[in-house]
Amino acid sequence: MVCLEQALHTQHCKTDIPPLLLSEDQTNQYLEEIPLWNFSSAEKSISRLFSFKNYLETIAFINAAAWIAQQENHHPEIKFGYNKCTVLYTTHSAKGLTLFDFICAAKTDQLVINE
């Protein structure tokens, strides 16, 4: 079920029920809510490259993203360098994208909303 009445970043991953694989139509609807994220049909994932002024800002962002992941119990793949960081979400247990990926992506976007 696509719940677009409530902003993605205000929703939570419900750990008491297994995440449901999204249809192509649902995926496309959610992608509209996080336009800076890239969809990979091959990897069945969404990812975004974040850029920062320096290493310290990059690490601070990673720590904040890790905190979100821990709170939601949904953990991304994070790759980083001096002033760049790529965050990738997919749901391994569902073998593709679920609402959890989009909730966490939207919450991660909130970390840099004023940039």
Where are these regions (language model features)?
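Charge-rich alpha-helical segments
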Residues: 1-115
